[in-house]
Amino acid sequence: ESESNQETEEDKFNRVDILAESDKGELTIIEIQNNRELTYFHRMLYGVSKAITDYIDLGNDYDKVRKVYSINIVYFELGQGNDYVYHGKTYFRGLHNTSDILKLSVRQNQKFFGFGLADGENVLERKEAGDLFPEYYILRVNDFDRIATTPLDQWIEFLKTGSIAPDATAPGLSQARECLRIDTLSSAEKNDYVRHMESIRYQRSVLETRRDEGFV
């Protein structure tokens, strides 16, 4: 599902939604957002909630509720913080013993994750109750300002600059590098690529201007 097929000036402020399903039935929402949105956190929550309800049939048992990952690639200052990658996860932590994290029972562990006794050990690989709940990742692309040394950083550098370093080895970047060979693109693909790069450049310019004017 995509909302990126706009041919107007608003194209530079578009967002792209991708919904992927793993072989385990888990859902991953990938969203790219260029323009500032005050209620973006709420929209993240809404998107995950909608995916959960859309992908369970009426009358299904609750154990058919899907695990959902929400990956949000944003080109604006979302929230306030010093990092450029954030991970949100649910924890059920004891109020009186804060080191006590609620785990699934043995039966729940086996039913929902299929885990038995760990190989060669008389212990069960126990999942936390929070592992059943959605997880969120936020990549604040414009805040990335370091040398890319990890696969994740290499991808973020690509998302920020639109170029891939010759020594980048992150999975998937070799395919992306091929797609960036402009001379092999069709006329329509070249136009899409140029418009995308112009969108990134324009949004970065707007953000820097707002910073200079004290709005950020």
Q: What spans do the regions from the language model cover?
A:
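Elongated, amphipathic alpha-helical interaction scaffolds
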Residues: 1-216
